[in-house]
C-alpha cells in the first residue's frame, strides 16, 4: 500500500465521518 492510496482512503474516512456528523446534527440525534 503506497502513500497516495493511504492518503485517499484516510481522506474518504474523514469526509464520511464529518458528513455523518452533519446529518446527526441536523436530525438532533
Curated annotation (Swiss-Prot):
The keyword Magnesium appears for this protein: no
GO CC terms: chloroplast thylakoid membrane; cytochrome b6f complex
Transmembrane segments: 3-23
Membrane-topology descriptor: Single-pass membrane protein
Localization annotation: Plastid, Chloroplast thylakoid membrane
Chief place where the protein resides: plastid
Pfam families in alphabetical order: PetN
Keywords: Chloroplast, Electron transport, Membrane, Photosynthesis, Plastid, Thylakoid, Transmembrane, Transmembrane helix, Transport
UniProt GO MF annotations: electron transporter, transferring electrons within cytochrome b6/f complex of photosystem II activity
Swiss-Prot/TrEMBL GO biological process terms: cytochrome complex assembly; photosynthesis
Function: Component of the cytochrome b6-f complex, which mediates electron transfer between photosystem II (PSII) and photosystem I (PSI), cyclic electron flow around PSI, and state transitions.
Subunit structure: The 4 large subunits of the cytochrome b6-f complex are cytochrome b6, subunit IV (17 kDa polypeptide, PetD), cytochrome f and the Rieske protein, while the 4 small subunits are PetG, PetL, PetM and PetN. The complex functions as a dimer.
UniProt similarity note: Belongs to the PetN family.
This protein's name: Cytochrome b6-f complex subunit 8
Biological source species: Rhodomonas salina
Amino acid at each position: 500500500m503506497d502513500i497516495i492510496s493511504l492518503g485517499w482512503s484516510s481522506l474518504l474516512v474523514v469526509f464520511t465521518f464529518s458528513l455523518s456528523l452533519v446529518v446527526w446534527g441536523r436530525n438532533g440525534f
